Amino acid sequence: MRNPNRTANKRRAENEENVRPDTLIVANSRYGSSNQYTQWLIDRLGADAMSYNKQQLGYTSLYRNIIWVGAIRDAVISNVHMLWQNHHNFGLDGKKIIICGVGIGDPENPDYFNKVMARSGCGPEFCSRYILPGRIDQSRLRLIDRPQFDKFLIDSKRIYGEETHLLVNERAADNYNGVDARALEPVIQEILATRY
């Protein structure tokens, strides 16, 4: 991911750009789906981006729009709580904040959506919220992550209910890949609307 302070400034200088982008994307990815969505957002919006790092979250204060793209783990968008805990310190009140969770559940299922957002602490007064289709390839799981993923597949019934439990187990067995640039269109349009 691009460092918003160093790499992005160098890129703008090389392209003779004088204006700092208005949007920062914070990507929290372990296996690449969130990074793929982030790259598509960079390409479409000319945004800066950084990988999640607790010590560098203060960079969010430099931008008008913040897009958080993180994996959904046990119905929680990874590390988004750090943004909520520090939003006053970073001066994020009044800024456009978009939260995107990436997971293997059905983004169109309201029950799945509501459970993820409730557990992630994303209040509607705070931000726009989206769930993007992710992917799973169990052969790529690191050895340390396998027991946690197996536990998730069992616990998904308790966390999400029967319908989502059956779906995520089926998708896990099939090595589901739903990552799709078209899923970002509402996010892109929401940012573009702030530029008119």
Placement of each model-derived feature along the sequence:
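N-terminal beta1-alpha1-beta2 submodule of the flavodoxin-like/Rossmannoid cofactor-binding fold
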Residues: M1-D93, E185, Q189-Y196
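FMN-binding flavodoxin-like domain, especially the glycine-rich phosphate-binding loop
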Residues: N9, E16, D48, D74-Y196
